[in-house]
Amino acid sequence: MLLAVLALTSCGTGNSLAKAEREAEVSRNVQQSLDNRHYTIAVDWMRPLGGMARHVTSNYELTVNGDEVDSYLPYVGEAYRLPYGGGKGLNFKGKINNYSITYPTSNRSHIEFNVTNNEDSYSFRIDVFNNGKAVIDIIGRDRDAISFDGEMIFKS
């Protein structure tokens, strides 16, 4: 009986160690990606200003590569000025301006930058947690704000 208890206890400890190692590896990958300014966040929820949160079913994502951003995100909300035909919304590539990163807590990184294209000017605020979870807030000059929840993905 004592042997069975010891065996079960040691299995639980092994699983805890493996989980802690995985969490530490994810945290290192997050930090390395942010330090290199090369990361992708896949979104699974959007929260329009004044609207209901909605699950996103397609492969929407935001990618930062150095001084450029590739935004492939859905947009639901009010737009105040649009080009003829409706425009591209939040589907664009652009040059990043005023990129900054701060660490308000030990498990959260806060990123801010601006992007201007021929349709609008956008302010991005991104919170990335050590577990890879992320919240993206986007404020457009000519559009209602929108937020997204997602997770950083690591490509092998």
Regions found by a protein language model. Give the residues of each.
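Sec-dependent signal peptide recognition
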Residues: 1-2
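C-terminal motif of bacterial Sec signal peptides marking the signal peptidase cleavage site
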Residues: 7-10
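Bacterial signal peptide processing site
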Residues: 12-15
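N-terminal secretory signal peptides
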Residues: 20-83
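A generic structural signal for short beta-strands and their flanking turns/coil linkers
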Residues: 37-39, 58-60, 65-67, 88, ...
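Short, solvent-exposed secondary-structure boundary motifs
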Residues: 47-56, 87-93, 112-119
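A low-complexity, Ser/Thr/Gly/Pro-enriched, surface-exposed linker/loop concept
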Residues: 78-100
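Helix-rich interaction surfaces within compact, conserved domain-sized segments
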Residues: 94-156
